[in-house]
Swiss-Prot record:
GO MF entries: histone deacetylase activity, NAD-dependent; NAD+ binding
Residue numbers binding nicotinamide: I98, D99
Deacetylase sirtuin-type domain span: 1-229
Lineage: Bacteria, Bacillati, Bacillota, Bacilli, Bacillales
Protein EC: 2.3.1.286
Keyword RNA-binding: no
Locations listed in the record: Cytoplasm
Name listed for the protein in its UniProt record: NAD-dependent protein deacetylase
Cellular component annotations (GO), alphabetically ordered: cytoplasm
Main location: cytoplasm
UniProt similarity note: Belongs to the sirtuin family. Class U subfamily.
Keywords in alphabetical order: Cytoplasm, NAD, Transferase
Amino acid sequence: MNKLNEALKKAEHIVFLTGAGVSVPSGIPDYRSKNGLYAGMSSPEYMLSHTCLVREPEKFYQFVTENMYYPDAEPNAIHTKMAEIEAEKDVTIITQNIDGLHEKAGSKKVVNFHGSLYHCYCQKCGMSVTAEEYLKSDIHSGCGGVIRPDVVLYEEAIPESAIDQSLAAIRQADLIVIVGTSFRVSPFCNLTDYRNKKARIFAVNKEQISLPYPFEMMESDAVKVFAEI
């Protein structure tokens, strides 16, 4: 049994911090790797910015619907194992991903730190709109307003509710497991600064990450690691 298995068995309050590397095995590209979403694109950050949404809503809509949605993607071993652990323990998943795969796998306590593509709303009347409706048109059939996905765009702040839920879970956790992220994007990478100092931290990632305090690094394929838990 590896150290992570042992720690998961002993822990009572677990937080998983997940990034793009968790969803890549499900066929969803990450952003910045050589085969990622941004590869070969001239201004992807602008296309996913608040400015683009306001100034060029048609261009924003085309980019998002053509590049961001993978409705046929299925959870992989990482998602399903985390959901299984949640059935037995107090587990909170705080994810940078916006693809809804943790929920699709059955996880209930998920903080979508950057929002979710599968929650959309009309900017004019505030009504919730299904992703299916948004994928057909970004104009709300009810009031004619422009629909947007409830995700955090460049130039936008993380919702306070997501930060509050994340900090509450982090402070209570006796085990924190960072999975599939380089853990360099702020404020997500600052969450562990608010941990209970007795909490153990593990990181499972294909590349080494760095933290300013002790943690256990598993430089490995997260799918293999979670398939063996």
